[in-house]
Amino acid sequence: QTRYNTLHFLFRLPPMMKKPAFRSLLVGLLLIALAGSFWYSPAWLQLCYGLALFLFGMQCIEEGLHNAAGGTLERLMASSTATPARGLMFGMGATFVLQSSTLVSLLTIAFLSTGLIGLAGGIAVILGTNLGATGGIWLLALAGQSVSLSPAAVPMLVFGILAGFLKGRFAAFGRVLVGIALIFIGIDAIKDGFQSVGGNLDFASIRSGGAMEVAIFSGIGLLLTVVLQSTHATLILTLAALAGGQISVTQGFAIALGSNVGSSISTAFVGFLGSERSGQRLALAHLLFNVVTAVLCLLLWLPLTWLVAQAAGWLGFNSLLQLALFHTLFNLVGLAVFWKLQARLAESLQRWLPDKAADEVLIPEEIPEKTMRRKQARYLSDNMLRAGDTALRAVFQEVRHLGALSLEVICHVLFIPAEMLYQEEEPLLEPPEPPLQLDAQALYENYIKAPYSELLEFTSKMDIDDEAQQQQLLQAHIAAMQLVEIVKDSKHLQKNMQHYLQKPDSRAYPHYLRLRAHLFKTMCLFRRAAAAPAGSEAWKEGSEALDRHVATLESSFRSRVFDKLRQDELGSWHTSSLMNDTNYAKRIGSGFQEILRVAGAVG
């Protein structure tokens, strides 16, 4: 699921290609071509088989750790980014375990976008992911081409599958064991594939010139990493090709350099397409780190490769260990450059990518129906689904966004400028000036139903096992559903509001003005209470003020209408309309009260 979501971000199809028939045809042709290539080259089939096992093993490890840890990963990351050194260590450890710097970077972007960690802490984690990627490469290089990992993988696979029949964390740890076993088997299959290719694939004989050769193989490393979504997978292929003699050491260095840039490009795509400003800043930081480091290493290419060759001669390193050493030096160069600049980099990123001006008014006062566009959810993206805490926080943020939209839709229904909601002092409402024209149904469908549908789709994809988090998600659903019902109730008010507020000579006119003012004050009180932290004194005072105001509808407004009816100042037709609309107003007030109670239960 995670890998599919990432590739979906990277390779968005043009509109014509989004048609199901065309997409099915394209996928079918690709599968036929791939099957034909397998028949033509058994060695290529062996390589793809090993790569598929490796990537699926990574996915198994990710899923297993997520299910075993619950919210531990989220809490660990939040506590591990308190200092730059701890953030660096967390990035190194997480990358070594998950075997994917891209995955850890995307997780970090998700945490940052929901406010679980700060930008400075996220930058430290990103620096750690690059160093963490070197750990697995050193182990594989030390194991060498002659050491087979499959004997260790077989018992792990057996125990992992057996554990999968159990429940809870045992099944999750079994999933991790299966993932590790598949990675081991996949690595052996990749090595066997390159051995089978033998002399049929010999890039080492290519000598196109120093700079051109480095550029070509750096591009190969970049493209491989973007497609495979894993620096580790690219470097394992490189190690296997290097051990089989298909590429030279210098070409391997260039592929390693390109793979680092490729991982940051993948992160940048997802970060910019599926994140708020904070996530975009971190994606840019990752891209800057790897691009600047790559440029420096290219400028220092000759002394850097000479240093690796000299160290290899002193220490007796083979070509595989030389690649691991170069990859480590590459990341150490970047760390040396950026470590002292983290704070300044964070400040620069804030300046380059400032927070988008928070539109006080989400819905313009005048919206031509022909140009009305559906409002999209603001905080929901597939990247937020990578961890339970980030997904839950994104849901809470989106419910708040839906709440703001709901208040503004009701303002439009009542013919009140939405910007009046955000004034510090409660403004004095003026009677609306005719003509009053508005389609409440169109407002509901475009500004409420559309983001609410996205919210429902997002929550259907969430995988949360923790009971406390499940309860919080349920409360968020209740709050969102209440907001939708409140807007639906307000739609019923529009017909009479639009009719009577354009007739100052009507007996019902002053009563609809008072009902309009009552509802506006209800919204203002709710907005102020909801803005305070749940359970705080300000929240309690705001909730009590709302309760008192809602109660006045029954004790004051309704009784006054009946008095006017008895005094023959209102006709029965007007009274019937006012009573019906008073019921809708009461339901709107009760809905706001219920949302505050839900917020208090969640905390």
Predicted regions located by residue number:
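Short juxtamembrane and helix-loop transition motifs at transmembrane-helix boundaries
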Residues: 9-17, 81-89, 110-118, 134-145, ...
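Transmembrane alpha-helices
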Residues: 14-55, 152-159, 399
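Hydrophobic, membrane-inserted alpha-helices
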Residues: 27-35, 87-91, 133-137, 156-163, ...
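Transmembrane helix-loop junctions at the membrane interface of multipass transporters and ion channels
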Residues: 27-44, 134-148, 163-166, 195, ...
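Membrane-embedded alpha-helical segments and adjacent helix-loop junctions characteristic
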Residues: 45-108, 168-238, 242, 347
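Alpha-helical transmembrane segments of multi-pass membrane proteins, especially transporters
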Residues: 51, 55, 71, 75, ...
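Membrane-interfacial helix-loop connectors
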Residues: 95-100, 104-132, 137-158, 225-262, ...
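Cytosolic, long alpha-helical scaffolding segments
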Residues: 117, 143-144, 273-277, 305, ...
